[in-house]
């Protein structure tokens, strides 16, 4: 696979809500547009993501907005609260950005916002970031994740050429959470039910008879099962690190702030445990 380029410094953009749509009982789409996205672009990677910057109640920031200046001038409890979301789609012709949100009632910040936001409202976003897209050099592709990875997996499937060899596994709570994806690849929807998150994914990947040739894998979602799937791919199947895009998007028992703070240490521990055995 080609070597990844250095990451560019993220830019701040302002998106205006164009429309919203409830895709499934627990997945809400918010489409952003407007002049504030005039220099935004997200057409390089299929795992592009943005950080939505939520302003704490009662706080306002000087214009032009500069997140680094805000962090220097404002007390920490008045900083924008970032929440990271994958880009489901970017349409450069009409300059519309689609973001999908998992809804868990009133829990969290981003989900409740997505459920209630109305067209015309504006929100600041930082980005995009990203580092993965299906490579034509791969003989076959493995895509596996939970609801949090569904937007990036769907974007990746839609970017693959017809006839590509793909094994795609997406774990959701039940059949009502399945979505239509514009791909000729077979998507295996795994229904979690009352099982722990990721358990069905682990079983499915372990049971998979790996095709011959070079695999490129995209595995994302809850950190616990991602760690175990990394062991399956890296240690048991001896996949090269450069062919793996694998990371915990979230972790049970942690909000995003706590997870992002502890993620470097978590990743270092996973590396120390698994790279010795690989």
What kind of feature is each model-predicted range?
Residues 1-278:
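Extended, composition-driven regions rather than compact fold-specific motifs
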């Amino acid at each position: 696979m080609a070597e990844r380029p250095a990451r560019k410094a993220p830019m701040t953009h302002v998106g205006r809500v164009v429309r919203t749509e409830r895709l499934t009982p627990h997945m809400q789409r918010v489409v952003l547009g407007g002049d504030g996205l005039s220099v935004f672009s997200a057409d390089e990677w299929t795992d592009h993501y943005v950080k939505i910057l939520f302003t704490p109640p009662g706080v306002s920031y000087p214009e032009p907005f500069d997140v680094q200046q805000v962090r220097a001038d404002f007390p920490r409890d008045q900083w924008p609260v970032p929440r990271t979301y994958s880009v489901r789609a970017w349409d450069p012709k009409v300059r519309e950005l689609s973001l999908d949100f998992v809804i868990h009632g009133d829990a969290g910040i981003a989900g409740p916002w997505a459920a209630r936001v109305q067209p015309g409202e504006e929100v600041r976003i930082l980005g995009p970031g990203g580092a993965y897209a299906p490579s034509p050099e791969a003989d076959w592709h493995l895509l596996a994740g939970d609801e949090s990875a569904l937007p990036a997996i769907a974007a990746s499937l839609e970017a693959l050429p017809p006839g590509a060899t793909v094994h795609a596994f997406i774990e959701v709570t039940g059949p009502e959470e399945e979505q239509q994806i514009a791909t000729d690849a077979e998507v295996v929807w795994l229904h979690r039910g009352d099982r722990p998150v990721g358990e069905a994914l682990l079983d499915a990947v372990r049971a998979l008879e790996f095709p011959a040739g070079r695999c490129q894998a995209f595995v994302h979602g809850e950190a616990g099962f991602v760690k175990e799937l990394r062991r399956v791919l890296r240690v048991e199947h001896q996949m090269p690190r450069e062919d793996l895009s694998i990371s915990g998007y979230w972790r049970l028992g942690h909000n995003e702030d706590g997870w992002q703070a502890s993620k470097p240490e978590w990743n270092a521990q996973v590396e120390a445990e698994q790279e010795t055995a690989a």
